[in-house]
A protein has these predicted regions:
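Surface-exposed, charge/polar-rich loops and edge strands
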Residues: 1-415
Length: 415
């Protein structure tokens, strides 16, 4: 069962939300955050990217930077830019991208569920990134930004959400940069909140879509606080962390594509010939060609697009990892032909995800920066859940969720 609870959110007044809200901390660097914040002293970047309050070049891992985050978080509350709700709520957060809307429930999940594996992950985490997020949680005594969860489709929850979605939202704005619509409702009916809690309790698992390091950090800080509290009961706020939970079928996963700097000493003709061992190769001409189905890839090379269809027997339909296109392309193209083994460390490969599209692949090859590009069909949410259920880990650079959650709509304090 998934243990969740409502919480007293800390959030901006309606008239300030567009001043406060921001992109998440991990999708932009310090200079981008500095530019986006500009002279806006109410921007959440002063809390989630507080190095912008120091001279250019200051490390985001400088101890003073973490202290500044806490100082700014307190200032935002003192100035009324962030205000805590007087009672516990669940919230609804909707995102609309290109005419499609996905509705998330903002809840507090239990750290024990993470530790026990009831909150399932599909990515490896790095200790240095965990420690960075742990420092941020510790110093602020809060989850400033939520984790992004998926849950199996649920008709009762969907009906409840749509009932609220037909009412006036608390927040409703078009975000800069992404241009997507973001809406936010407060669930204040006790019966509705009990329904949400009950329906989640029937779910065997929740799935981390995005935010593996934030999840790990929240659980580890919760465990620390348990040890530090001789009167620990188990219902304290530090046992919970903030998540936005979406129905799996509503989520949009975009293609996460590859560009390579060289062909491992092969000519174009030799490379295409090598591909024919495991793929049906078809020249699609000079117009951009997007993969149409699983196990089909698009190759851009020498101003031409090619379709590559993996031959029968090159993958195992019973293996949740081996059947993934990211694994097929890594094994049979990047590793076997191009000798690019470790995608995380190789300098010969880069990744292009999200909304930049295949035009960005073409641009980076045409300008000579890269030698060839490989476009993949997107991973499905069902594939991610199958892998998480099997206890396995997705290959690196496999998933790109869009839209990203905006930060600053609501914050969860740990005490």
């Amino acid at each position: 069962m998934a243990i969740i609870k409502p919480f007293k959110g800390i959030r901006p007044p309606k008239e300030l939300v567009e001043k406060v809200e921001s992109r998440p901390y991990d999708v932009l660097d310090s200079e981008e955050a500095r530019a986006e914040a500009g002279d806006n002293v109410q921007s959440l970047y002063h809390i989630i990217k507080p190095e912008i309050d120091f001279p250019v070049g200051t490390s985001e891992y400088d101890p003073r930077v973490y202290e500044k985050a806490a100082e700014n978080f307190q200032k935002f509350q003192d100035n009324g830019w962030l205000v805590q709700d007087s009672r516990e709520h669940y919230y609804i957060y909707a995102q609309t991208m290109q005419g499609k809307t996905q509705y998330g429930l903002v809840v507090c999940a239990h750290t024990d569920d993470y530790m026990k594996g009831n909150i399932k992950k599909h990515e490896l985490t790095r200790r240095d990134k965990e420690e960075d997020r742990m420092k941020h949680v510790r110093v602020n005594n809060a989850n400033i930004e939520p984790v992004f969860f998926a849950y199996p489709d649920n008709a009762i929850l969907n009906e409840l959400i749509m009932r609220y979605a037909a009412t006036e939202p608390e927040y409703d704005f078009i975000a800069p940069i992404d241009g997507f619509r973001h809406q936010f409702w407060i669930i204040d009916d006790d019966n509705d909140m009990q329904t949400i809690t009950n329906e989640f309790s029937k779910m065997p698992s929740l799935y981390i879509a995005d935010g593996h390091h934030r999840s790990a950090a929240a659980a580890l800080v919760g465990a620390e606080k348990q040890k530090q509290n001789p009167n620990h009961r188990g219902d304290e706020e530090y046992n919970y962390f903030m998540a936005v939970c979406f129905q799996a079928s509503q989520l949009t996963i975009l293609d996460y594509n590859r560009v390579v700097k060289d062909l491992n000493g092969l000519s174009s003709e030799e490379f295409l010939a090598a591909l024919k061992k495991n793929f049906e190769v078809a020249d699609k001409g000079t117009d951009i060609y997007k993969p149409q189905q699983l196990h089909e890839f698009s190759l851009y090379l020498d101003e031409h697009w090619y379709s590559l269809k993996a031959k029968e027997g090159t993958y195992d339909n019973t293996d949740p990892i081996g059947v993934l296109d990211v694994d097929i392309s890594s094994r049979l193209i990047l590793d076997e032909i191009l000798n690019i083994g470790d995608l995380r460390s190789s300098k010969r490969i880069d990744f292009v995800g999200g909304l930049r599209g295949l035009g960005e692949l073409k641009r980076r090859v045409d300008n000579g920066e890269m030698r060839a590009a490989l476009a993949l069909y997107p991973v499905t949410m069902q594939q991610i859940m199958d892998i998480a259920d099997s206890g396995k880990i997705m290959p690196p650079k496999a998933t790109w969720f869009e839209p990203k959650l905006r930060s600053g709509l609501v914050i969860h304090k740990l005490s």
